[in-house]
């Protein structure tokens, strides 16, 4: 079974690069729940830049994210996978207004991609057709926005992010077709996997999503990212999934490092713990503990990939 899986995976990944890129999902709030300012973001990015120079976010207007993070990212030489929240009309209008106000203040090279929605299909916030419409609306919007040097943002791809299992469902096709690039999220923890099965499950999820997207786009030569994956270091168990530093370290090596070795780009969830987050019913405190680093920037486990 494992040999068949690896053979199929190799077929799917025939055209990818030798080593996948690494990015980090980055929270926009301090431990006390207040919003990070430019200097705080600069501190975060200065700390992260020896590990990656790509970060991913979820919204533009919330916490003045683009207003504060954009200049910090440009100053530190980072690219942003910029999330845009599309789920309700008022929020979406605020997102578009923020794009129009703050994209002209930075360079187009600072934005790696616009990502419209984060698991909007998985949560059933939008239908695939509704999400496709929002993606196309952002494409039209950014074509008319120029950066601080007069360059158009039309060169920046516009995509979306959703859970792997939703992407392999045929109902997601309108959104996949509209998106220039699609990121796939996969968490073995939320699938109640034991540690022994966690990395295998992650690979299987990623393979299914990638194969679906390659088929939809009619090519194996597509840009592809795992938009979120990781393992919590504290909180309650979820089925056979047990949060711990040891298990997170194991999933980093056998899951994240291994995916990158196959040429898969991975945006890890997440850079730093977020102590401000509330407990979630049934998974007490787990949302606070997904960071590779504690909120004070103490590393929890080695993130050097060991390919031995």
UniProtKB/Swiss-Prot annotation:
Disruption phenotype: Exhibits diminished extracellular biofilm material, renders cells more dependent on chitin for wall integrity, and attenuates virulence in mice.
Location of the protein in the cell: Secreted, Cell wall; Cytoplasm
Induction of synthesis: Induced during biofilm formation and by fluconazole and micafungin. Expression is also regulated by RCK2.
GO biological processes: adhesion of symbiont to host; biological process involved in interaction with host; carbohydrate metabolic process; cell wall organization; fungal-type cell wall organization; single-species biofilm formation in or on host organism; single-species biofilm formation on inanimate substrate
Any one Gene Ontology cellular component term annotated for this protein: cell surface
Glycosylation sites: 197
Annotated PROSITE patterns: GLYCOSYL_HYDROL_F17
Catalytic reaction(s) noted: Successive hydrolysis of beta-D-glucose units from the non-reducing ends of (1->3)-beta-D-glucans, releasing alpha-glucose
Signal sequence extent: 1-18
Source species, domain of life: Eukaryota
UniProt key word Glycoprotein: yes
GO terms, molecular function: 1,3-beta-glucanosyltransferase activity; glucan endo-1,3-beta-D-glucosidase activity; glucan exo-1,3-beta-glucosidase activity; glucanosyltransferase activity
Role this protein plays: Cell wall glucan 1,3-beta-glucosidase involved in cell wall biosynthesis and virulence. Crucial for delivery of beta-1,3-glucan to the biofilm matrix and for accumulation of mature matrix biomass. Plays a role as a major antigen in human systemic candidiasis patients.
Similarity field: Belongs to the glycosyl hydrolase 17 family.
Protein name as it appears in the record: Glucan 1,3-beta-glucosidase BGL2
Organism taxonomic ancestry: Eukaryota, Fungi, Dikarya, Ascomycota, Saccharomycotina
Gene responsible for this protein: BGL2
